[in-house]
């Protein structure tokens, strides 16, 4: 065979071939494309595909059983958005970032079809949707099925990493990095895998503490003596067990949960902060990410959320409490020209300070903690989030209640003081005495009727004092914090907030925002910014050292 032609099966091509053949032209020369051996242009070394220097495992949340394969479609949308941003902003890099979906839900057995068998038939569609989505949260909080979910995701992550390394043998040798992007409940499961969190061990410790604190009110002297001996024996046994464990520790090395170290952990629409708060994690005073996720496990933790996402919560106030009054970092629009780097953005207040109208207002404003060099600016996006509106309403209700309470007690005090009574000599002498120094503040209270010593007044102030010390009684470990804790800044910002649209409806976005991260170009550019930042820092180190 000397010549090979390629023909099209389109209808127009067939009509053209028929007409040209009837006119006397050959079939090959009329509508076909002749194929030749060889190549048109010689290939070069630069024509090879770019090397993968960073892989990103994309972990889904709830609802995967309802729509199997959805994580593959979502990852494809995120990969496509990342490719557009790479071509626009990172075209000078010889490497690229690869996104790999992690589908862990379909392989789990859990309760089988038990929940489906007990589901009523009325409104079956809605019930099936809830069983396929929200039921995953109940499975994870169940002590019976939690381990199955954790092991399912852990094994799938390790399997995909081993498979990728087998097909790319030089990935680890050339220092390839691994990051994880988790969504919704997947953030909590991924966090527990990295931290090795075991609620069973904590429950055993709680039971052990309860056993060590029996009721000694009705014990006799002999019973208390035997109980003391039992405590000493248990303490001695615990010391021997610790020594034995210390001897076995060098020979037994604990296998890490993951076969790789996580460079960046991106949480999207994450309820992780709620789970950590319910587990007893309280704000500290260090300002470091190690308070919730040590650097030895993950180099960087970043929390991405939409302002109206009802499932997402902030993580920064769990590290430093006063960051609840500081707005999250606004994520740049993908088409912003010359955006300010995120590490150079200064914290902004959520509620700008107003001019004090009274002494109490000025004290409250002065007591608002803020980092050093933090400008008091309004939020740089259109409108406030629903969370801020709710917070403002709660604070407003509290201030109204406080004002009504003060008016009530002051009114009650005036009515009691209106009764005629002659001032005593002691009181007149006290009036002639010089007033206290300005540095001290005195509270003048009037005696209520039938209370010679001001019983109701003292009860009122004791009630206020008890409410002031209530958090100290509940969480005594967080009481001894210095007044300078409000001046501590975070080492790195963790909470990053997407910008709201100009004509975006908050009620509609509250329904759609939880699943709007996958196709967002802003999110794709944000992810690539932090992934390529490591390569830029690595390349800049030798030049800085030479200087």
Swiss-Prot record:
Compositional bias of kind Basic and acidic residues: 423-434
Alphabetical GO biological process terms: phosphatidylinositol metabolic process; positive regulation of mitochondrial fission; sperm mitochondrion organization
Tissue-specificity statement: Predominantly expressed in testis, in round and elongating spermatids, but not in spermatocytes (at protein level). Also expressed in the brain, and at lower levels in other tissues such as thymus and lung (at protein level).
GO cellular component: cytoplasm
Residue ranges occupied by any DDHD domain in the UniProt entry: 258-533
Enzyme class: hydrolase
Disrupted gene: phenotype observed: Knockout mice have defects in the organization of mitochondria during spermiogenesis, leading to sperm malformation and male subfertility. Genetic loss of DDHD1 leads to substantial reductions in polyunsaturated lysophospholipids in the brain, and reduced mechanical, but not thermal nociception.
GO molecular function annotation: metal ion binding; phospholipase A1 activity
Keyword presence, Isomerase: no
Modification type Phosphoserine: residues: 370
Disulfide bonds: none
Subcellular location per the Swiss-Prot or TrEMBL entry: Cytoplasm
Pathway as given in its UniProt record: Phospholipid metabolism; phosphatidylinositol metabolism
Positions of the UniProt region annotated as Disordered: 414-448
Regions of compositional bias (Low complexity) in chain numbering: 435-448
EC number(s) given by UniProt: 3.1.1.111, 3.1.1.32, 3.1.1.118
UniProt keyword terms in alphabetical order: Cytoplasm, Hydrolase, Lipid metabolism, Phospholipid metabolism, Phosphoprotein
Function: Phospholipase A1 (PLA1) that hydrolyzes ester bonds at the sn-1 position of glycerophospholipids producing a free fatty acid and a lysophospholipid.
Subunit record text: Forms homooligomers and, to a much smaller extent, heterooligomers with DDHD2. Interacts with SEC23A and SEC24C.
UniProt record similarity statement: Belongs to the PA-PLA1 family.
Name assigned to this protein: Phospholipase DDHD1
Lineage: Eukaryota, Metazoa, Chordata, Craniata, Vertebrata
